[in-house]
Every structure is written in structure tokens, then in C-alpha cells.
Amino acid sequence: MTDQHEKKIQACRKAVEQHPQDAEVYFQLGLACRKGKFLKEAAEAYETSIHLNPKNKKAMHGLAITYRKLKRYDDSIAICHEILKLDPDYAKVYFNLGLIYEEQGEWEKAIKQHRKALDLNPDDFQVHYNLARGYDAVKDGSKAIEHIRKAESIADRENDEKGKNESKILFLALLEKLK
């Protein structure tokens, strides 16, 4: 954890002490703790934020991500479905569901969720990248290459060097499999 993360967490903890009924300060604490890898504290902060503001989709999504990182998949899935009841067009929730299914090795389900995320946000590098991985896992090389090319194009357009490098590595691996 960086000093910056530590300072942010300490500032958020102090804000919680000063404003114990403010859902937003708990949300910020959850976010800071999640980024700092304090996942249990992040979950507690998000839970409190949601208790104070039950329709706070950002806090719910943060909790769903945290539960996924804690491998509490059923809890994460349940929260994702609650968010989608409030907002069926929340693309990041479909992406998170896709990640859950990837981590469980359920590639068909992962692809389905990533496709929903892609329908809502067609220029998302990470969704295309994950779809390429998913299609590769289910042995659909042509779709895998289609999505990795789209991911590479998006990364190129956005001057995302890390994305370009990741795309090239996966693209070369996919080509090697097709030989």
C-alpha cells in the first residue's frame, strides 16, 4: 500500500468519526480501503453506507466488487441483482458479474454478462479484452480475435500503453493457438 492510500484511509476514518451519519463518508472509506487492500474494512464501510442510504448504487457496487475480491461470490451476485433492479443499465454491474463467473470458471455465463456490459458501453477496452479471454476459453478463436482487435483499437485510440501491450500479448497467444 502506498503512502497516498494510507493518508486517504486515515482521512476517511477521521471523516467517519466526525460525520457518523453521512453515507458518503462511509462510501469514500470503503473505496479507499478497497484500493488499499483492506477488504474486510471496505466491506464494513460499504455496508454502513448502504444502511444509511439503501439506494446508493455506488456503495452497493463497491460492496459487490469487495465481496467478489473476498470470494464471497453468492453475496456479490445477490447485490449485483439488487442494483440491476434499481438500474438495469448499470454496465459496470454486468462487468462485475462477468468477472465473478470468470473467477468461477463459468465462461459461458461470463461471456453473457460481458456482452450485456458491451451492449451498454461498446467502447470499453476491458470488456472487449475479457470477451476475448472468454471466447478463447470456450474455444471460439475467431470471436476471441475479433474482440482483442477491438480492445487493441480502443487502447490505441485512447493512448493506453498498458492496454496496447496487454492486447498484443493476448493477440499473439491467440494467433499461436490457431496455428
Protein language model features and the residues they cover:
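TPR/TPR-like (Sel1-like) alpha-helical repeat modules
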Residues: 125, 129, 133-160, 169-172
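Helix-start (N-cap) detector for alpha-helical repeat units in TPR-like alpha-solenoids
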Residues: 23-24, 57-58, 91-92, 125-126, ...
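Register position in tetratricopeptide repeats
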Residues: 35, 69-70, 103, 137, ...
